[in-house]
Each structure stands twice: as structure tokens, then as C-alpha cells.
Amino acid sequence: MRRIVLFAALFLILFQVKAELKLPKVFADHMVLQRGQEIPVWGEADPRQWVNVTFQGKKYRAKADKEGKWMLKMDAFPKGGPYILSINTKKESKVLENVMMGDV
């Protein structure tokens, strides 16, 4: 009986582990992105989950693979800012503020 209870508790703990929307450290508030070139954005999310990115009024979408990795390319933009970069999944969102476009 104890084994069954222990197994059930372990099962619940393992399946409650939450996969997070993760971004590399290069994506942060106050970052500067290269102007005039496509901009790759990537990270990790729940496997096979859609990731939505919004920047300067344009929306982009990518689907995480079976390991949770995703990547998309945003259009090239001219210099300017500050802007907001929003990255969302069904469960979570990240907002990067004061994003500038310029020469890196």
C-alpha cells in the first residue's frame, strides 16, 4: 500500500513540472537589435506548443518541436525605438521593453 501511495505521489510531482517559456540571455530589456536585417528569435516552450511574437505591430508565429525548441525570423526594421517585444504561449508571456533598432 505504501508503494502505491509513494508511486502516486511521485507520478503527480513529475507531471506537475511546468515547462516554461525560456529565452536566451541575449533577449532582454534594453537590448539593441541590428537594423536592416532579418532578426532571428528563438527559445524553448512546451513541446509542440505555438509561440506568438509581436514587434512593432507585426505578428509572427512558430511551433515548438517535440523537444520544445522553436525559432522564427522577424522582418528587417529601420533604426528606431524604444519598442516592445512580446513573446507569448498559451500559458505564459514575456515582455521585453526598451528594445532599440540600430547598429550592433
Task: Please describe what each predicted stretch is.
Residues 1-4:
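Positively charged n-region of N-terminal signal peptides that target proteins for export
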Residues 9-18:
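Hydrophobic h-region of N-terminal signal peptides that target proteins for export
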Residues 18-47, 99-104:
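Non-catalytic, glycine-rich low-complexity segments
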Residues 42-104:
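Extended acidic/polar, glycine-enriched regions
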